[in-house]
Amino acid sequence: MHRSHRLKKNEQFQAVFQRGSSAANKQFVLYSAKQEGQAAFRAGISVSKKIGNAVVRNRVKRLIREAVARMESDIPVGLDLVIIARPGVEAMTLEAIEQSLLHVMKRAKVIKQAPVHNGKRDGKRG
C-alpha cells in the first residue's frame, strides 16, 4: 500500500467515522466512506494498546498493510477505509489476516467478489 494511500490525520479518520458505514467481524471493524474525486482508495489503520506493546502493534499494522496491498486491485477507487484491529489479531498469520479482512470487506460491500489469486477464486492458492 503506497504512502499516499494512507489516512494519517485525525480529521481524516473522524470524517470516515461520521460519514461512513461500518461492518465488523471477530478480528476487525471496518469503516468505509465514499470520497469523490480521488484517484485511488485510502486506508487508515488503528491498533489499540489492548493488542500489545509497540513491537506487537507495529507488526500487526505491517501485516494489515500487506494484506490490503494484496487486495488493492479489488478495492474500488474513491473510498476511504478505516481498519480497527481487535484483540486476538496479534496471533494471526498474514494469510489469516487477509482472509478476515476479505470477509469484513465483503460484509461492508466494499468488495463484490472473491479476488483472483494465481488464477483461482475463493482465496485458495496453488
From Swiss-Prot:
UniProt keyword Coiled coil, yes or no: no
UniProt-listed Enzyme Commission number(s): 3.1.26.5
Catalytic activity of the protein: Endonucleolytic cleavage of RNA, removing 5'-extranucleotides from tRNA precursor
Keyword ATP-binding tagged: no
Key words of the record: Endonuclease, Hydrolase, Nuclease, RNA-binding, tRNA processing
Gene Ontology CC: ribonuclease P complex
Subunit structure: Consists of a catalytic RNA component (M1 or rnpB) and a protein subunit.
PANTHER family in UniProt: RIBONUCLEASE P PROTEIN COMPONENT
Protein name, as recorded: Ribonuclease P protein component
Phylogenetic placement of the source organism: Bacteria, Bacillati, Bacillota, Bacilli, Bacillales
Gene: rnpA
